[in-house]
C-alpha cells in the first residue's frame, strides 16, 4: 500500500493594491485550490519612489491594511507585513514557508510592472510557480 501525502500545500497570496478579501481573484483562486494560504503585503519603497504617496494616501493604506489584517485574523490567519524589496522578500518568505505557488493581482503602472517582473524572475529561479490575475 502506498502512503498518501496528507500535507496540504500552501500558496502565498501577495496583496498589492487589492487590499480586500471580497472579490479578490488571487485569493479566490487559492481558496478553490483547497490549499493553506499565507497572506503577505510588502511595502516596497522603490516601487513608489517615482510617485511618492502623500499623507492622505499613506493614511488610506494604513487603514486598508489594518482592515485587511483584521478580516484575515477573524478567519484564523495572520497578514504578514514587511518593508523592503519585494523581489527579495517574496522569494525569501516563500522559501522559508515551503510555498509551492505565489498568486497576486497584476498592476499596470510602470514601477509596479517592473516589480512584478523582478519578483517573477526571482521566484522562477527558486523553482516557485507564480500566477497573476
State where each predicted segment sits.
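Trp/Phe/Arg-rich N-terminal binding region typifying the photolyase-homology
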Residues: 1-133
